[in-house]
Amino acid sequence: MSPTKTQNSAEENIRAELGLSAEVVTIRRNAPAALLYEDALKERDTAISNAGALIAYSGDKTGRSPRDKRIVEEETSKDNVWWGPVNKPCSERTWEINRERAADYLRTRDHIYIVDAYAGWDPRYRIKVRVVCARAYHALFMTNMLIRPSKEELENFGEPDFTVWNAGQFPANTHTSGMTSKTTVEINFKQMEMVILGTEYAGEMKKGIFTVMFYLMPVNHNVLTLHSSANQGIQDNDVTLFFGLSGTGKTTLSADPHRLLIGDDEHCWSDHGVFNIEGGCYAKCLGLSAEKEPEIFNAIKFGSVLENIIYDPNTREVDYEDSTITENTRCAYPIEYIPSAKIPCLADHHPKNIVLLTCDASGVLPPVSKLTPDQVMYHFISGYTSKMAGTEQGVTEPEATFSSCFGQPFLSLHPMKYATMLAEKMAEHNANAWLINTGWTGSSYVAGGKRCPLKYTRAILDAIHDGSLAKEEYEVLPIFNLQIPKAVGDKVPASLLNPSKNWAEGEAKYTSNVKSLANLFVENFKTYQDKATEQVLAAGPQL
């Protein structure tokens, strides 16, 4: 079968860009999974699992490198970008050096892969993304994670809106101005390009596109980008957004047999409703089992990519309990591998419920509380949870951690911009907001408290979705001033709902623990208080 005109055009453009000879270099554009498997298996250590997934390894870097992320400081975007520890500036000269370094590396390869696909399921807002890389595993990963074009769309794809140059096998030059290591992940909003050097971790590509959408959607379209999962009721079409950091239950709780999954990680809220940014899921694998998370377990099959896992070399069976390489074992698969996925992944209904998830190891936050609009802004900007032992090197006891908008590493603009947009959209569409603690109750993790059982959290969500929880009688939790329901139907013990009344060491000890956590909130919020209203500041804990 002869290549299409667009196929030739895309390849010719890349050849011209890099100065490649047709005789020396093979370019594969939107190659099928079977072909990418064949190429990937030529790399050392790559294998196929007994379930049919491609097993690949990302080298030394098994997670993102946030300290090495940079935004090019240039005139079109510099007044919008939230500069600081999250978005460190680099000069246009440094960008040019690193982009050319990436191109130089790609010129040395005998195979180059192009993935042309979309970010954003709503055709009104989607962007055309081109990924250029040298590893078949990276090509399959992004084929899964982006929205795959139809044959007709691919033939008429044209020029991309944004291009990722992934030369991650090749290090950055540490003598280049502004380099702090051999890794750099750089985004240029003027050129609409991204360069990766010194890391083969595939998640950098996915989260790079996310950062781009965090910029383009609010700035160009007044569309709110969110680090959230989303689902929709099968009968009532009601949409729920779930915000939460790693380990809070965002993926688990959005997978509901009575609801359709719109997406598990990245979404946008427009004037028309909610749409997923991605065409796939990037699920954590540590501790995965068919019993606990059957939909994810069964999605690991031919076409999926297993990253940095340990397997039995004789049977090719994966050991999901083994974290020898990293705690951050992952699998990337197309979203249609999830039976409950809503395809296309968008809803023309606005969210009825907003759920902020936290895993509070101090045990002082209630299992559920109803939030006022100002409290939503405060807790959304705070983005609190507890970092559990084992999630990062050196963490041996739970630590309080804050990540603004529940996605600080990916934000392009000041957090207050996203929080204000969220509050405006919630007010316009009369959405309810809830803070759900999936962490400890009765006492802290350290003092022997118990984690809130998943069945009770699911019962709370059922009461939110059927509207009964909004009608319950409420009482106020002091200091944090949270509204706590006195009952959640007959599925959740009433004694579980108010931590001040069920604290194992008594109310005085509870109050002491509340004040300790409240102080952490107040200290963290000092970063944002210059742009916060008095009402939002008053919505936080009052000591």
UniProtKB/Swiss-Prot annotation:
> Which GO molecular function terms does the record list?
ATP binding; phosphoenolpyruvate carboxykinase (ATP) activity
One GO biological-process annotation of the entry reads: gluconeogenesis
Q: Does the keyword ATP-binding apply?
A: yes
Q: Where is the signal peptide?
A: none
Under NCBIfam families, the record lists: pckA, PRK09344.1-2, PRK09344.1-3
**PANTHER family on file:** PHOSPHOENOLPYRUVATE CARBOXYKINASE (ATP) (PTHR30031:SF0), PHOSPHOENOLPYRUVATE CARBOXYKINASE ATP (PTHR30031)
- Family designation: Belongs to the phosphoenolpyruvate carboxykinase (ATP) family.
Protein's recorded name = Phosphoenolpyruvate carboxykinase (ATP)
Organism (species): Kluyveromyces lactis (strain ATCC 8585 / CBS 2359 / DSM 70799 / NBRC 1267 / NRRL Y-1140 / WM37)
